[in-house]
């Protein structure tokens, strides 16, 4: 890739939700193809999955970048991690998380993204990032509507370039998720313990 690995986070706090964080996430998982905005068309290739299921490969038509394939490498009652399939231009991962924070349900999207080449970097700098941000905000707005509650404040967004050490931690985390999924198919007696479930860069700062 070209340039630093970037971490972007979008989140919304929901008050008065009809559903628990896990129930809301279950609805999001099943209705993923319906809740994503048109700018993130997950029906770009007919016949491909539109529901988040572990191991599923989903095709998303992302703004500016075109069709990108991502695989669901981790799926729990309140979290999903999608990792770019090798060979596609979006070199990174997407994490969705629904959790209880005090009296509100926080739903967040975390992106780990590195442009694949110079042309990709220039395009993202020119128009792609603002369109991408609006798309993730549109998804969170749809989730608020799905929850039956109301956002307590505008959708929040922050981003930062990760240094080399942080980038290595994230890349290791992604690789371990892939190994963990492969191990899950093995007998329990053969599975290693201790895989991290949270990106190391987020453990102290955001989760």
Regions found by a protein language model. Give the residues of each.
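Hydrophobic-ligand binding "helix-grip"
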Residues: 61-102, 202, 206
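Secondary-structure transition/turn motif
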Residues: 62-64, 85-87, 110-115, 173-175
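Short, intrinsically disordered, mixed-charge
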Residues: 26-34, 77, 87, 103, ...
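Hydrophobic ligand-binding cavity/cleft-lining segments
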Residues: 1-61, 169-207
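Beta-strand secondary-structure signal
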Residues: 9-11, 59, 81, 95-97, ...
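Beta-strand/loop substructures that line and gate deep hydrophobic ligand-binding cavities in soluble
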Residues: 87-131
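A conserved amphipathic terminal alpha-helix motif
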Residues: 114-166, 170-174
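Short secondary-structure transition/capping segments
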Residues: 82-94, 152-164, 197
């Amino acid at each position: 890739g070209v340039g630093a690995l970037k971490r972007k986070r979008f989140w919304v706090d929901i008050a008065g939700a009809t559903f628990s964080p896990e129930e809301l996430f279950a609805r999001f998982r099943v209705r993923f193809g319906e809740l994503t905005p048109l700018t993130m068309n997950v029906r770009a290739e007919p016949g491909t999955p539109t529901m988040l299921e572990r191991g599923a490969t989903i095709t998303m038509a992302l703004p500016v970048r075109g069709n990108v394939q991502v695989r669901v490498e981790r799926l729990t009652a309140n979290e999903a991690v999608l990792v770019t399939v090798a060979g596609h231009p979006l070199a990174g991962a997407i994490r969705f998380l629904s959790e209880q924070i005090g009296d509100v349900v926080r739903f967040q999207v975390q992106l780990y993204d590195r442009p694949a080449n110079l042309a990709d970097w220039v395009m993202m700098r020119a128009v792609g990032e603002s369109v991408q941000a609006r798309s993730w905000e549109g998804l969170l707005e749809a989730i608020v509507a799905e929850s039956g509650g109301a956002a307590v404040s505008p959708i929040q967004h922050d981003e930062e370039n990760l240094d080399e050490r942080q980038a290595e931690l994230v890349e290791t985390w992604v690789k371990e998720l892939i190994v963990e999924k492969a191990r899950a198919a093995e007998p329990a007696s053969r599975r290693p313990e201790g895989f991290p479930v949270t990106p190391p860069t987020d453990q102290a700062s955001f989760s």
